[in-house]
From Swiss-Prot:
One annotated Gene Ontology cellular component of this protein: cytoplasm
Cofactor(s) named in the record: a divalent metal cation
One Pfam family it belongs to: NAD_kinase_C
The protein's name: NAD kinase
Signal peptide from the UniProt entry: none
Sample GO molecular function, one term: NAD+ kinase activity
Enzyme class: transferase
Native organism: Methanosarcina acetivorans (strain ATCC 35395 / DSM 2834 / JCM 12185 / C2A)
Family: Belongs to the NAD kinase family.
Length: 275
């Protein structure tokens, strides 16, 4: 086989997910060397390897068993993400293409070689210090539920807009079908190098989504010096920001990588997922 080492990382709170991991290990342990993430391994009572160390072990791809959130968590652990193959054990999943009944057969095919798609990510900085890298989106929201915040958004030091809203979402093309879409933003083909800026429940009719070049530097500043806000990154981690803080977003030099398993066009795939 072309692939000799694979990683497996999964949700750990659902029996059917853990059983799928067991089935994959049982089927492939004699064919390839398998590294199981520490969290999953602890539940299965086997030896584990942190996802962030799998590249050092020579792992060539990671099989993520769960939903989109599982994929995002695994990617976030890697500075330079390995290719990911998602097994869909959730509900609606844009980042997980393989259904459970097709998992073993699909992995068999992938082990003989695969291609992958690169998707841009966004580095998030707070007062000059890097926090995380987002694959889907960065949301700046009020720290208090049902309270609006006032903030300014700059693109390359040019004022894009000053908004009063529940918040604002900055999404990659990959994330344009997630929170940004629910907030009224456009769906962006991943081949388009862009970042979507989507106000969330803005308090003025002229506030509209923007699509800006991916090489732009985006700056967010709170205008109301009495209110704090929260940055949520891919719905996984959050950080509180204060009125004097400066948030900056830049395109990351390390893309996410997703194993390509079909030639279905992007538009047909989105229609199928949303139908």
């Amino acid at each position: 086989m072309a692939i000799r080492k694979i990683g497996i990382a999964s949700r750990c709170d659902r029996p059917e997910v853990l059983q799928m991991v067991r089935d994959i290990i049982a089927h492939f342990y004699s064919k390839v060397q398998i590294y199981v993430s520490t969290a999953t391994a602890d539940v299965l009572d086997i030896e584990g390897t942190p996802v962030e160390r799998m590249r050092d072990k020579g792992v060539e791809l990671i099989i993520s068993v769960g939903g989109d959130g599982t994929v995002l968590r695994n990617i976030a652990k890697m500075k330079d993400p390995l290719p990911v193959l998602g097994i869909n054990m959730g509900t609606l999943g844009f980042l997980v293409d393989v259904e459970p009944e097709d998992a073993i057969e699909t992995i068999e095919e992938v082990l003989y070689g695969f291609s992958y798609l690169e998707r841009m990510r966004v580095d998030v900085f707070l007062n000059g210090e890097m926090l995380e890298t987002a694959t889907n989106e960065v949301a700046v929201m009020s720290a208090k539920p049902a309270k609006i915040i006032q903030f300014e958004v700059y693109v390359n030091d040019c004022l894009l807009d000053e908004m009063r809203a529940d918040g604002v979402v900055f999404a990659t093309p990959t994330g344009s079908t997630a929170y940004a879409m629910s907030a009224g933003g456009p769906i962006i083909n991943p081949r388009v190098n862009a970042i979507v800026v989507v106000p969330v429940a803005p308090f003025k009719l002229s506030a509209r989504p923007w699509v800006i070049p991916s090489d732009s530097e985006i700056t967010v500043k709170l205008s109301d010096h009495k209110k704090e806000a929260v940055i949520a990154i891919d719905g996984q981690k959050s950080y509180r920001i204060r009125p004097d803080d400066v948030v900056k977003l830049k395109k990351s030099k390390y893309p996410a990588r997703f194993v390509r398993i079909s030639d279905t066009c992007f538009y047909e795939r989105v229609q199928r997922k949303l139908s």
